[in-house]
């Protein structure tokens, strides 16, 4: 089977909500840094907005009354662009930019296909999955690296 390395499939329905003691201790220690991490990620997100403004992409909408943690920074390629998100992904990865494709529509996973779900039943989720790319975002992302990401996207999309 020809599987792309970013893809994943749900073969079975299952849950695992257990957290180890070590994970709990690590999580508790990280809470002290949470505000700093969120502020830094918000600065990086704002810089992405500024650097990518005017490009044929859509940004994730953020409620003005909320503060996003920007766990991810997702852009969506507009339909007017003559490049697929997979091609953009591949070209950015060739430049050593660690972008990701996320959120494969769950109704297209084998488990749900066996239940009768098929392509075309949830068009918006399919369109989202076919256009969304997660850009690098982490507290220590340098301005230089972020500018390189933005410059690369501009070069590829134009």
Question: Predicted regions span which residues?
Answer:
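Short hydrophobic/aromatic beta-strand micro-patches
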Residues: 74-78
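Internal helical hairpin/lid segments
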Residues: 79-87
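A secondary-structure boundary/capping signal
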Residues: 27-30, 102, 137
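Short, solvent-exposed alpha-helical surface patches in well-structured domains
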Residues: 40-43, 87, 148-149
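Active-site region of PLP-dependent enzymes
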Residues: 1-72, 107-110
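PLP-dependent enzyme catalytic core of the Aspartate aminotransferase-like
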Residues: 81, 94, 113-158
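Conserved PLP cofactor-binding pocket of PLP-dependent enzymes
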Residues: 1-5, 47-51, 87-120, 127-133
